[in-house]
Amino acid sequence: MGIKGLSQVIADNCPSAVRHNDIKNYFGRKVAIDASMSLYQFLIQVRGQDGQQLMNDQGETTSHLMGMFYRTLRMVDNGLKPCYVFDGKPPTLKSGELAKRASRQQKAREEREEAKEVGTAEMVDKFAKRTVRVTRQHNDEAKKLLELMGIPYVNAPCEAEAQCAALARAGKVYAAASEDMDTMCFQAPILLRHLTFSEQRKEPISEYSFEKTIEGLNFTIEQFVDLCILLGCDYCDPIRGVGPARAVELIRQHGNLDNFVKDADKKKFPIPEDWPYQDARRLFLEAEVQEAKDIELKWRAPDEQGIIKFLVEEKGFNEDRVRVGINRLVKASKTIPQGRLDSFFKVLPSTKKEKEKPKAAAKRKRDTKSSAPKKKR
């Protein structure tokens, strides 16, 4: 679910915290990607001409592998060094949200069957996408493919977004990449959205700065997390009557959720008695992650024959296309730099250069004046 309305809050209160870039701007950057979110995207978006998920002759879904292979190729073609992070066990507090998702999926399955009988193809497709979920098999097959491609991955002990954020905070990667805005609640210094979208969508990558966000809001980290909980997250339902603008106003007025829960008008803001905001706050501020210092990210040369065996022989992919993809992967593995120059050299702010310009111009003027021939009287 992410954080409801957070992108709108940032756009309204601190627009300088987000910028939009082309993928080429991230040449040489290491990025930790939320694998579960990516696989979910692939299962929904990577479809055949009939609108159905891609399958092999055995009836096995292959949309997730097609997406993982070609979207990863697009990244390495542009000089990025991706690593994927997979979800571990969900926190107990998330069980309610997971139960709601399961209920929605069951309802969508029933509506899809009904649409098959009386509805249009568009209706069937709409409800079919709502039934999508990432299974253990999808995860295992994605990990196998990444290993064959030489792309590192990490198994998070709990939430993948939290582990991505931890890797970014430790400097192991430049940014965390996910469509879920709650990645910012885990204090990822930089969040990239739309990184794993297809090239055909021509969607620029949105880069969110955590530091500029809390500076623009004039919030502490704790206040920002409280704001996100108030907006509505996977761990806590939102409070009826509290939208993005009102949530910002309430945190500024009360300072934190403790004061809001204690002092708020309960008729105006019906807060459930068992609203677990303190547990949610703890999950964001003290997330269960593997220590970044214990994680070594290594990008290796691809196992060309292994990829052919897995994708072509086992999963029924077109061999010619896979071989072209392998060639792109091999080329990228030889040309992607170890690091960017701007990570080694300190870039001076442009303001200093601007200040120096008038002085330099004045000096040139004096030099020109002194060297000019004097007029005879």
Swiss-Prot record:
Mg(2+) 1 binds at D34, D87, E159, E161. GO terms for cellular component: cytoplasm; mitochondrion; nucleolus; nucleoplasm; nucleus; site of double-strand break. Residues 360-377 have a biased composition (Basic residues). GO terms for biological process: base-excision repair; DNA replication, removal of RNA primer; mitochondrial DNA metabolic process; UV-damage excision repair. Keywords: DNA damage, DNA repair, DNA replication, Endonuclease, Exonuclease, Hydrolase, Magnesium, Metal-binding, Mitochondrion, Nuclease, Nucleus, Phosphoprotein. Residues 337-345 are annotated as: Interaction with PCNA. One of its GO terms (molecular function) is DNA binding. InterPro entries: 5-3_exonuclease_C_sf (IPR036279), Flap_endonuc (IPR023426), HhH2 (IPR008918), PIN-like_dom_sf (IPR029060), XPG-I_dom (IPR006086), XPG/Rad2 (IPR006084), XPG_CS (IPR019974), XPG_DNA_repair_N (IPR006085). Binds 2 magnesium ions per subunit. They probably participate in the reaction catalyzed by the enzyme. May bind an additional third magnesium ion after substrate binding. It is an enzyme of class 3 (hydrolase). Its main location: nucleus. Its EC number is 3.1.-.-. Structure-specific nuclease with 5'-flap endonuclease and 5'-3' exonuclease activities involved in DNA replication and repair. During DNA replication, cleaves the 5'-overhanging flap structure that is generated by displacement synthesis when DNA polymerase encounters the 5'-end of a downstream Okazaki fragment. It enters the flap from the 5'-end and then tracks to cleave the flap base, leaving a nick for ligation. Also involved in the long patch base excision repair (LP-BER) pathway, by cleaving within the apurinic/apyrimidinic (AP) site-terminated flap. This is Flap endonuclease 1.
